From Swiss-Prot:
<protein>
    <recommendedName>
        <fullName>O-acetyl-ADP-ribose deacetylase</fullName>
        <ecNumber>3.1.1.106</ecNumber>
    </recommendedName>
</protein>
<keyword id="KW-0378">Hydrolase</keyword>
<comment type="subunit">
    <text>Homodimer. Interacts with RNase III.</text>
</comment>
<dbReference type="InterPro" id="IPR024900">
    <property type="entry name" value="O-Ac-ADP-ribose_deAcase"/>
</dbReference>
<dbReference type="GO" id="GO:0008428">
    <property type="term" value="F:ribonuclease inhibitor activity"/>
</dbReference>
<feature type="binding site">
    <location>
        <begin position="122"/>
        <end position="126"/>
    </location>
    <ligand>
        <name>substrate</name>
    </ligand>
</feature>
<feature type="domain" description="Macro">
    <location>
        <begin position="1"/>
        <end position="175"/>
    </location>
</feature>
<comment type="similarity">
    <text>Belongs to the MacroD-type family. YmdB subfamily.</text>
</comment>
<dbReference type="InterPro" id="IPR043472">
    <property type="entry name" value="Macro_dom-like"/>
</dbReference>
<dbReference type="GO" id="GO:0001883">
    <property type="term" value="F:purine nucleoside binding"/>
</dbReference>
<dbReference type="GO" id="GO:0042278">
    <property type="term" value="P:purine nucleoside metabolic process"/>
</dbReference>
<feature type="binding site">
    <location>
        <begin position="33"/>
        <end position="35"/>
    </location>
    <ligand>
        <name>substrate</name>
    </ligand>
</feature>
<feature type="binding site">
    <location>
        <begin position="11"/>
        <end position="12"/>
    </location>
    <ligand>
        <name>substrate</name>
    </ligand>
</feature>
<dbReference type="GO" id="GO:0061463">
    <property type="term" value="F:O-acetyl-ADP-ribose deacetylase activity"/>
</dbReference>
<comment type="function">
    <text>Deacetylates O-acetyl-ADP ribose to yield ADP-ribose and free acetate. Down-regulates ribonuclease 3 (RNase III) activity. Acts by interacting directly with the region of the ribonuclease that is required for dimerization/activation.</text>
</comment>
<dbReference type="Pfam" id="PF01661">
    <property type="entry name" value="Macro"/>
</dbReference>
<feature type="binding site">
    <location>
        <position position="25"/>
    </location>
    <ligand>
        <name>substrate</name>
    </ligand>
</feature>
Amino acid sequence: MTSRLQVIQGDITQLSVDAIVNAANASLMGGGGVDGAIHRAAGPALLDACKLIRQQQGECQTGHAVITPAGKLSAKAVIHTVGPVWRGGEYQEAELLEAAYRNCLLLAEANHFRSIAFPAISTGVYGYPRAQAAEVAVRTVSDFITRYALPEQVYFVCYDEETARLYARLLTQQGDDPA
């Protein structure tokens, strides 16, 4: 039986999955890093959907998640979450990052999505140390999938080889085959 958790090194915008997670900022208006890449690849329909969410409920708070159509992406939907800015680890960053992953998974489960792809949330300009963020991600997702049937497949999509090796090592340590 193949693992429900897999590591992929590459471009998250190119994946054909039910949901791609966007490491968004609170405004949901696009930005740098993976957020900008997803907005560019999805086209203007994604920005329009994000504007509508902002009009209806305001900014997306740290640790929360919202869902939009995927625009021109191959995915069915984009789940936007706001991870914490790293401030040394003493401002509930781990709890907020855990909430971001969990809330994305809850949206995926509620929408009956079979597959979801996560970037390394908060590890870019938000400065969360990659190793610590990966531990939170793997622990949170592993815990979730032991209790829920969906999503059936979770991908950790890493932009660079070093981060991909880090996630693969963590999955191997817990007994999952990351390939």
